[in-house]
Amino acid sequence: MIKTVIKRDGSRQPFAPEKLVHWAKWADEKLGLDWKEIAEAAYRKCIDGCRTSDLQQAMIEACVVDNASTAHQLFAGRLFIGNVYHELYGDKWSIPSVKEQHDNLADKGVVERLHFTEEQWEEINSIIEHKRDLGMKYSQHVQISKKYVLRDVNTGKLFETPQFAFIRMAMWYASKLDKEDQVKTVKEIYELLSSEVLCSPTPDYLYIGTPHGSSPSCVVVRCEDSLNSLSAMLQTVWACSANGSGIGVSLELRSPLDPVAGNTIQHAGKHAYYKAVDALAKANKQAGRAGAVTIHYTCLDPEVVDIARWKNPTTPPDVRLADLDFSFGSNAAFADAVREDSDWMLVSCYYAPKLWELLYQPDKELFKAEYERVKADESIPKKLVKARYILHCVLRESVETRQYEHFTDEMNRHTPFKDTIYSSNLC
């Protein structure tokens, strides 16, 4: 039984169940969830003398660990950003104006001071919509708070909320224009960023308007199924991350149970290598954050459904790869299978290397011919799955964790590059 709790300021006070109820009812507004069940689950998980933030975190975990619906993600997201607002602006959420926020960060040397007129500051302040933070899912808040908003690298305390980050970037871009165009441009760019129509490069979030003055730097890396290629890829990820680059990686590796070393070893799959990429990228800090990597995987991969879920907060912690970004690749043949609601073949690159290579070619007929040959060859291990099931899994993760998509054939048809394109980068 919880009798006392510790507040944010360190003081102890009697536990007030009505406050827990208030948090749960507030987070559930217009969502229609069983907020009582969520609050009770949080209460059962915490002990006497816990912190109030522990209770909020327990409610978040009750949503994202045990449930995967959009409503639960929104419920948890509201609790998360509510906690951020409490830490930044106090119990009454005394949110500063855009000018007050900017001047505060400029005084600390976090951002470069911008020189708008008082009238412009008032107009800009009318643009920002803080309520949009309450409409973001938990997975979005976690990603933004870890990667994109400015923070004190020593204490970990955030300097800004998502909406303040969007307006900061918009103001910096607009400050380079003529006075008469500045406020209009702030509004246009803020709307694009805040409504998620435009996804800006990660370095922009971190550097725009700050003394760092860095610009995006992007690298793509191709890894094939050999020890030498793996070694070179891992070294490249480490070196590029140390130099501030965002990295797009395509790993064409064997799948679980594929033979290794003349059938003396069974392959363990891609997870360990993805985890190594993640660790090497995070080993080097870029303005307080780790390096950023986007893993590209395809519709042919036997692990496709598992890979799609590795970023999700509901995935077990020992498997979860929360700090990597993922992009799903497919071609016209896969789209046909989705449209026709037919089966789709999953096969390892070890058994069908030519098919995997043709996935990146614009010639649809060549791919289909090789696809049918591999499918008919009974000596090649494979499995058939409904194409719509694969796409459904990927699209669900796109909504929950901002997963991306690319079209392997189209990006090699509509291109000025002579070399085959295997991956891109979020920048």
Mark where each language-model region is.
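Extended catalytic cores of very large enzyme megasubunits
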Residues: M1-C427
